[in-house]
A protein has these predicted regions:
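Well-ordered mid-protein domain cores that form the structural environment of catalytic cofactors
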Residues: 1-9
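Conserved polymerase palm-domain catalytic core
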Residues: 8-171, 175-190, 232, 277
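Short, low-complexity, polar/charged sequence segments that are solvent-exposed and flexible
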Residues: 32-36, 195-197, 255-259
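Right-hand nucleic-acid polymerase module
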Residues: 42, 99-135, 147, 153-154, ...
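Flexible helix-coil linker/hinge segments at domain or subdomain boundaries
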Residues: 196-206
Length: 295
């Protein structure tokens, strides 16, 4: 995509983010698309079991769970002078988080200030009597979300082909690039209409994360301008920044990388010390460095 922009004399770029993507997927559309991909009129028994488990899920808040198990809240744990052991580590927990412990708190209630209460284990709230969404992070979630978006993707690809542009989507992050002679607002309206047609009633664009960028040649260099404000603003997409000349990694992406790296090293050292073993650096290299042996 960045190469395509660089080769143009100028273009428009529209990036959008879908609000609460996994939480707002329509179960009826998902089932219909799943059947369509399989080429069947109804899901097989094993497929339907997976579908039902993903559309009738429950969840809990980890802090509420720790409170029910007798642990101090997050702020208290943070403010204590001495280090607090990891509450989820069985070997050092005051209460071992066994299945029996968890079963004992399943019916636990949390009372709100208005006198209402909620159970520890919750289910997604219904909207107009209907449940939406699938859990994020399950082995099937990414695949099913792509199956769900097939018609929307096809519609957007066809639109970009007609006007000589490019469409890309990664999960809930969407970017389209097209000739600068075409109005960005016009394309935005068409994407919004396509989402309404193929995405269901609850899947919406997050207006706070919409970016409209125009790449134009200023003197001899390609420059990115925010269409809304008229000031310089590089394109940001999937952790990268492109200003018309260079593709850079976003600073927040680097910060997150180093934070995870330091956390992994610290955890490996503590684990090795606790079990009186050596630190295995190969796994750290493989996950966070170019020093790992190529697969």
């Amino acid at each position: 995509m960045f190469d395509w922009i660089a080769q143009t004399q100028g273009c428009n770029v529209l990036t959008i983010d879908l609000s609460s993507f996994f939480d707002t997927l329509d179960h009826e559309i998902l089932k219909k698309q799943w059947q369509r991909v399989n080429g069947v009129s109804s899901l097989s028994k094993d497929n339907y079991i997976v579908f039902k488990s993903l559309t009738h899920y429950s969840f809990l808040n980890i802090e509420d769970t720790l409170t029910a198990l007798g642990w101090p809240d997050r702020l208290t744990r943070k403010n204590l002078n001495k280090k607090i052991p990891n509450p989820l580590r069985k070997e050092i927990s005051a209460r071992h988080q066994s299945m029996e412990d968890f079963r004992s708190i399943r019916k636990h209630k949390f009372f709100n200030s208005d006198g209402t209460f909620k159970y520890l284990i919750q289910t997604p709230e219904k909207i107009a009597g209907k449940r939406y969404g699938i859990p994020q992070g399950s082995p099937m979630s990414a695949i099913l979300s792509n199956i769900y978006m097939l018609d929307f993707d096809q519609n957007c690809c066809d639109l970009m082909t007609q006007i000589g542009g490019i469409y890309r989507r990664y999960c809930d992050d969407i970017v389209v690039t097209f000739p600068e002679s075409i109005s960005i607002d016009e394309i935005y309206n068409k994407l919004e209409k396509a989402l309404s047609t193929h995405g269901g009633q609850q899947l919406k664009i997050n207006p706070a994360k919409v970016e409209k960028i125009q790449f134009s040649h200023v003197t001899t260099r390609l420059t990115a301008i925010d269409v809304t404000t008229g000031i310089y603003k590089p394109l940001q997409y999937l952790g990268f920044i492109y200003d018309g000349e260079k593709v850079l990694i976003r600073s927040s992406s680097l910060s997150n990388y180093y934070r995870r790296l330091v956390s992994k090293i610290r955890a490996s050292k503590n684990r090795a010390k606790r079990h009186k073993k050596i630190v295995y650096r190969r796994k750290i290299y493989r996950m966070y460095s170019h020093l790992a042996r190529k697969q």
